Amino acid sequence: MEFVRNEVDALYHEMVVDAMGAQSEYNDGPMAEEPNSKAREFYDLLHAAEVHIEDQEKVSQDFYSAKKMINVLGLGYKKIDICVNDCFLYYDEQSRNLTACPVCGESRYEPRNMSAIRQKDVPRKSLWYLPITPRLQRLYMSRKTVEHMTWHLKCRENADEVIHPAGSEAWKHFDETHPTFADEPRNVRLGLCTDGFNPFGCFATPYSCWPVFLTVYNLPPELCMKSEHIFLTRIVAGPKSPGKKIDVMLRPLIDELKELWTNGVETYDSFRQQNFIMKAALLWTISDFPGFGVFHNWVKRNIFWELPYWKDLLIRHNLDVMHCEKNFLDNIKNTVMDDKGCTKDNTNARLDLQLYCNRSELELIPQDDGIAIKPNASYVLTREQRALICQWLKELRFLDGYASNIARCVNMQELRLFGMKSRDCHMFMQRLLPIAFRDFLIDEVWGPLTEMSNFFRALTAPIIQVSNMEMWEEKIVETICKLEKVFPPAFFDLMEHLAIHLPYEAKVGGPVQFRWMLFDYQVCSGLLEDQIQIKRQLEFIPWFKTTVHSGRYEVDSRLLPLVTDPVNNVRVYNGY
């Protein structure tokens, strides 16, 4: 039977295809299939949870039975012994029976207590790994997410406008390089992010903790970066940064990614009621610049090159735009506001001007008493101008939810801005900087600063225009050159140079909202930090009492009253 009979039918057919999307090959198959064994266990457990539990029945007899029940949900973890120096994992068949590290020779287990009745080996150090395969399978088992896992097919129509990584040049290049992987739209594309933070607060003992997250790019923009779709794979514990040893920590994750790429895993699609082989690929990593040095260390070949497709990626690492923007703004506000100790226009900077630049009007003027006078620069505000800006920021108000209270970052006594978070700098750079400095700086200074504000505003737009990014690739170089004519050489560190690479990454990788660390990744890290602090507050007092009373340590006598409960047997006197 002929579907398109005439011109009217052809137009109608084209309209339906444009509205609903063309049918893909993965829809052609059995109308319905039974779930595989893993999916059936998952559905049976969900069904059992709906059944009323009688009074005489119990959920589980012991803790071991409860753990077995939870493992069916895909919430299990792997406990892996690791060398005390973080140089080797005891987790494969060849290394499980080893008792010492083959790299450094350190013992795997703690020394045995000969007086103990049970002689059980206790590892000196362990790590916990959360597998990603069961969680990816659950995205297809749940009817709330399974329909959205193939959304990325619908966002590739306009070649100049990119609203999602699926429409980017990097995604299309990957599909062209690996057509077999691209033929199955249900295959998963992932992004990996990590960043270090101190779980005990900024003013506590220095400690660096590195959570490793994965996000799923198959989902539409409104779901892609939500915290419920960001998976924690493991936490690299401190107290120091892992450095190049992070490759050892990532070994289980890389092996699982290789298995998902090579063989895949049988997964049940609850929407189409089909079993299929799901594969996954890691498109890129995301971190700030110090994290880039940790992830893609320059002293050896990093572990990501073990992935068979890693060499074919156009972008292997994404510079975090928000951190680049914050560092850029910090240099601007500290120099323009003449923040003592933070400004880039200090005495050493003026000496550099004398050595490397032909700007005699800014050179230090020596005096007879040995003190040099620093001439006023056109890019530095006077005290009265700084007072006006600080007062304006102090009284500035925004709509609810638009921005945080920037008044808390204003110090009226010292006339400086302090404690600005990444989101504060993001808003100040794009919205407030051109307004704040317009009446106080000359056009030769205010103009390039405004161009930088427009640059970051275009860069962080929800819809990336490829032609616009190509324009900014050339224009940002001119803007940096204009700034070099104004500010001293000390103003330009590595962060100012990194801005030149950001338009290319946006053009190739798509909108930066899917490739930066802020908001959702930091929310997940913040939740971890809050949980650690709550646990510390609950467990510290019992630990402190037990440690002081144990007698294992020499304790200052002044600590004993802190762990001694009040005495109820006290003398009572009558009062008048």
Q: What residue ranges belong to the model's regions?
A:
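A structural signal for the principal folded core domain
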Residues: 1-576
